[in-house]
Amino acid sequence: MARRPGSSSRGPARSDRLPTEAVTSARKPHAAAPTPPASPDPGLVLLGEFGRPHGLHGEVRLKSHTSEPLAIAGYGPLHASDGRTLELANVRPAAGSSPDLLIVRVKGVDDRTGAEALNRVTLAIARERLGEVEDEDEFFLTDLIGLTVEDGAGTVIGTIVAVPNFGGGDLLEIRPAAGGPTALLPFTKAFVPSLDIAGGKVVADPPDDLFAPPGPKPADDPG
């Protein structure tokens, strides 16, 4: 779960439903460990991504995107990006300093070959299973996809099509209203001073050259 840029955190949610406060795509990632974008399907919320196999008996590394990494095991069957429905078992922290890196076993996967097939597969949960957020400052990053982007004068400048994170913080990928290539805008209070998910829009203060085409390469640039 994400929060509006510049807002403060709150206490845990009620325990009589799925713990929505555990789901996040907006945590500050560890250096050199970029997180994947919010699910391109607005009906799904990303929970994690598998990595390399661990050992010979079906265990596999999993990067959890929940605020409590081990909580990912409590969501039951999950949507996998390869089209399968998968359920986790025997979840434990991996050795090392990254608390969001786990060693897990997937039900029905009992050997290294099966674990290798999971590498780079992502896990997601249906948005409706998470219920509604209880704090107006909280939302899921997937809720941003499809929102209209306006400037301070109320002029529509584009639409959010994705929320990637390459290690330096969440970004809004915006398709310009006038057409052309998308552009990336940092999802910070400075660039996105106002957010109205219920109203279907965000107000942005982008740089003037946000949608400007890249300039010519220097003559000595080997690329």
UniProtKB/Swiss-Prot annotation:
Keywords: Chaperone, Cytoplasm, Ribosome biogenesis, rRNA processing. GO terms for molecular function: ribosome binding. Residues 135-210 form the PRC barrel domain. Signal peptide: none annotated. GO terms for biological process: ribosomal small subunit biogenesis; rRNA processing. GO terms for cellular component: cytoplasm; ribosome. Residues 1-12 have a biased composition (Low complexity). Residues 1-44, 203-223 are annotated as: Disordered. Transmembrane segments: none annotated. It is found in: Cytoplasm. The PRC barrel domain binds ribosomal protein uS19. Belongs to the RimM family. An accessory protein needed during the final step in the assembly of 30S ribosomal subunit, possibly for assembly of the head region. Essential for efficient processing of 16S rRNA. May be needed both before and after RbfA during the maturation of 16S rRNA. It has affinity for free ribosomal 30S subunits but not for 70S ribosomes. This is Ribosome maturation factor RimM. The gene is rimM.
